[in-house]
Design a protein with these regions (language model features):
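Cys/His/Pro-rich metal-binding microdomains
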Residues: 32-35, 78
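A short beta-strand-turn-helix
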Residues: 1-22
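Structural microenvironment flanking redox-active thiols in thiol-disulfide oxidoreductases
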Residues: 44, 55-67, 99
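Non-catalytic, surface beta->alpha helical segment in thiol-disulfide oxidoreductase systems
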Residues: 73, 78-110
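Short pre-active-site segment immediately N-terminal to redox-active cysteine/selenocysteine motifs
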Residues: 19-22, 26-30, 73
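Hydrophobic beta-strand anchors of alpha/beta hydrolase catalytic cores
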Residues: 23-24, 54, 77
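A short glycine-leucine-enriched loop at secondary-structure breakpoints
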Residues: 68-72
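Typically the conserved alpha-helix immediately C-terminal to a functionally engaged Cys/Sec
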Residues: 35-48
Length: 110
């Protein structure tokens, strides 16, 4: 899984217009639900490798990004399509629900 540090300049303003949709996982190391979500996020990254970028954002280490994204609770997931549109999901999700969201993003990307 790639580290969000690489993408900080790219993510400013959420003007993503890349060739691949993105799932951003805003988390904290001390957050129980975030820890529970991690295996599902890692599985999603492996299953959709090459078709979907999955990035993790530690809100304590990336406060400017978390503040800009108005993250008020963790985990918060951003599902970003290739046009840069963001669908926000607060709270942990079961893997099957994550997979449905990922399939929709990848399918819309063509």
């Amino acid at each position: 899984m790639e580290n969000v540090q690489t993408y900080l300049p790219y993510l400013r303003g959420y003007d993503y217009t890349g060739k691949m949709p993105v799932v951003l996982d805003f988390y904290a190391t001390w957050c129980g639900p975030c820890k529970a979500l991690t295996p599902s996020i890692e599985r999603l990254a492996k299953e959709f490798e090459g078709r979907l970028k999955v990035l993790k954002v530690d809100v304590d280490k990336n406060e400017p990004l978390a503040r800009a994204a108005a993250i008020r609770s963790v985990p918060t997931l951003f599902f970003i399509d290739i046009d840069g549109n963001i669908e926000r999901q607060m709270g942990a999700m079961p893997y099957d629900a994550l997979r449905v969201k990922a399939e929709a993003l990848v399918g819309a990307a063509g």
